[in-house]
Swiss-Prot record:
Active site, UniProt feature: D90 (charge relay system), H147 (charge relay system), S252 (charge relay system), S252 (schiff-base intermediate with substrate)
Stated name of the protein: Phosphatidylserine decarboxylase proenzyme
Gene Ontology biological process terms in this record: phosphatidylethanolamine biosynthetic process
Cofactor: pyruvate
Amino acid sequence: MKSRLFIISQYLLPHHLLSRLAGCVAECRARWFKNAFTAWFAKRYQVNMNEALVEDLTAYEHFNAFFTRALKPDARPLDETPGAILCPADGAVSQLGPIEHGRIFQAKGHSFSALELLGGDPALAAPFMGGEFATIYLSPKDYHRVHMPLAGTLREMVYVPGRLFSVNQTTAENVPELFARNERVVCLFDTERGPMAVVLVGAMIVASIETVWAGLVTPPKRELKTFRYDEGSRAPIHLEKGAELGRFKLGSTAIVLFGPEQVKWAETLGAGSATRMGELLAVPVQA
């Protein structure tokens, strides 16, 4: 009954209004508030501040600065397996596996369209049909910056407007097409393993999504918008393996896609496996 009421509330709540309010709270600079709230949050979720570049909770200008905190340079060593594809974020594997018949597995009884996830452009989605996906959920206690699984050159970014359902096991099992309905930012890269997509999916009270090349991604009118980076006079944007790609200001999920016969997921990983940025996510399929 509790789960059913929770799901009903997800459809009734004003997602974007709540997220804007959460964003205002998270950016509050009043020392008495931001210090108390940050201390409560760090204790409630057992955040490990020993690995943070700035360990003093009171040194952050607001809660969002704490939430998107940088780590010490040696906190996340990169896996040295030849050709390793790295975990892009701290968190847990929600699901991973093949993209079958254009669908990505969400939870028992549910899948979602890879085409819709990527914004609805068949040409953009075609290289990933029959490929592989990994969905990684970032919990409140996790480090909330997302990094490159593999070195790549940015080709395209697509902002896809949508709802902001909460993302957790309950919603994954009960909200159809969850990740293809929530607001998201799709980042397309050319890599040595062919096209790679990293999709940053928003959720309830996720105030914003940022990328290192565009900053805050919030197009006017919240309409679907495509940004091309492989044409015109602008210099190519190349990011090395392990480099920061973007960050969540509160919450959610990163989904990584590769084309067919390009990668094989690490045998140690499965649904529910904990991940740390820089650890082995996959190895290349040998030609």
